Amino acid sequence: MTSLETYNDNVKTALIMCFLSGLSTAIGGLYVIFIKQQSHKLLGHLLSFSSGVMIYISFMDLLPESIAEIGFYNANIWFFVGIIFFAVILRFVPHDHDESGDSNHAHSHNGASIEKHSSEKKEVVDDDDDDNNGKDKKQKQQKQKQQKQQQQQKQNIAKSKNKKKSKDDYLNSVGIATAIGVSLHNFPEGVAVYLACLKGIDVGLPLMLAIAAHNIPEGMAVAAPIFSATGSKWKAFKYCLYSGLCEPVGAIIFGLIFKEYMTPYLIQSMLAAVAGIMVFMVIKELLPAAFKYVSVDESAFSNIIGMIFFFFSIHFLHSMLPHDHGGAGDGGHGHSHGGHGHSHGHGHSHGGHSHDSQHVESPQSSSFNAFA
């Protein structure tokens, strides 16, 4: 088999791996959709759990990796660029729940005022008529009282419906914002999986499995608020699917079309910006939504469980795939750096260092690289 044929096979494998990794986001959405009993309390725990996963990814994986590669100052600059960028994006996401609530309140208040004025007017007219007929006055008063009670019941029902619609609109906007953040996060992940798979399946497969593992709770974070707000399984699944498909799209756009522009510095800058996006999304969208349905203590507990889950998923995957370390693993580790587009491999940066010194650094570095 020629080198060109081998390269073409690796490209096909890389694209398939990116597609499978992206589909795991939809798996998280399916889990939420097919839970038999939906409750707001469960939604609060799911949002808190997903917040913990995203915080852990940002501060224990993406940002440390970028700091190591492009420096503390540059990584932090791009981190805050990501925050500003996502804050601007959120301005275009509908958040009309507050306005809706105020508007409904205003309409309700105006309606009540008009009704009161109309009622007073009727009473004046009735008083004039009642001078001639006292019996009719009593009957009309009773009728007016019944009409007021019926009108009040209608207002209460309308107010309840408006309140529910306001809450549903809020949850829907949270889901859309989360989908945008996850989509932006999946673009560089697709590039990472693609480049790693070009180096070989022994490098690409562990990375794909690792990214797929943390895409599942991300899918849950997208689907939970949308499904709770709309009740539409298809809409919740659709947003998860679109978010996940950003991985193969990212691989195609950045890995194939703009391959020559994807420098190590640019990739690490993108990952630092993604860390900022995810942190801001947690602070601005996920946690405030979670606090509406669970207490702060309950939210904190689920948040920490999410971090622990992600921590163990990393080590479980590394224990199941030991060939990525030691011996051939050193070579694989070097490839993994290349796969992420990093600016150095151990053979280059440590030049005269012994093979043993490379092996010592491999497990720690690869644990950071696995989810970049």
Swiss-Prot record:
Pfam family, one: Zip
Disulfide bridge map: none
Coiled-coil ranges from the UniProt annotation: 133-167
Highest rank taxon of the organism: Eukaryota
Start and end residues of each stretch annotated as Disordered: 99-166, 328-372
Record GO cellular component, one term: membrane
Gene Ontology molecular function: zinc ion transmembrane transporter activity
Keyword terms, alphabetized: Coiled coil, Ion transport, Membrane, Transmembrane, Transmembrane helix, Transport
Membrane topology, as annotated: Multi-pass membrane protein
Membrane-spanning residues: 15-35, 42-62, 70-90, 170-192, 207-229, 237-257, 271-291, 301-321
Record's subcellular location: Membrane
UniProt name for this protein: Protein zntB
Species of the source: Dictyostelium discoideum
Designated gene of the protein: zntB
